[in-house]
Amino acid sequence: MRPDKGYDLTEKELKALEKRIYDSYKEAYDGLTDIIKEYFAKFADRDASEKARLDAGDITEEQYKHWRLAQIGRGKRFEALRDKVAERMTNANAAAVAYVNDATPGIYSLNRNFAAYTIEQVTGDVGFDLWDEQTVKRLIVEQPELMPYYPPKRALKRGIDLAWGKKQITASVTSSILQGKSIKHMADDLQSRIVTMNRDSAIRTARTAVTGAQNAGRMDSYFAAEKMGIKCRKEWMATLDGRTRHSHAMLDGEVVDNDKKFSNGCRFPGDPQGRPEEIYNCRCTLVSVIEGIDTSNGKRRDRYGIMPNMTFAQWEKSKRGEGYLQR
């Protein structure tokens, strides 16, 4: 089954979110250039003296390597470098989390509305209200578990903090020394590896949060439909390409009651209550299965008459009191 319009609109929002995150880390990367160059330029002078001793046979390769490692273990200059880089990365990570939190309410409302649209496309106007992201933001205050959200304290528990960053920086330089890399390679590796690792992790976190918000929003409409007397169930729809995990490809097309979990233990794709291996970086979505109705050729009625094949944009317009057929 091809992804629906709601999925496509969500992907568009995700691309914009990923760009904001990418730009944030690009700024952090650029800001580290002078800091790292300055440190390794000074380190190069001292390193050249020790290398000369090695070449002259005054010390062994092992002694030279231990000297280099000692500069990390007790070097104040390295500690200053490490702290500056870690602080930059922590700030970039905090910005990425803020971007995710800013985007997900809009994703939730978009998919809540789209799910309502797909239901009304075959049942007629049953009174769904049009939501916006401000509505969702107000609900999050009352119901914190409504959708994925990363407050500062929770973000720190996820390892996005200074202590974690310092360990990664030390590990990067230590690895370069043990591999016998040149000063230039050490500097390049530190700058690219730390930024790329943090950026890629942030983008995967964004994808996970967006998928969770997308499908939590759809579930909201499914439960609302049931309260209106519409019998519907939920169907797992996988993104069938080479990047989809095998277990989710096997879930494609599985249908369960709205209050039940799918066979992988998730209520919906990106379920924050699911196991990490089932939700992290998930790109699947939900569709509604309405009992006794073939949705493949549905027609719509708004207050102004029957409207076949109404688009999502037209449906939104009608909900604002601007009937598509009224024109």
Question: For each of these PLM feature ranges, what is it?
Answer:
Residues D200-R301:
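Acidic, glycine-rich two-metal-ion catalytic cores of nucleic acid-processing enzymes
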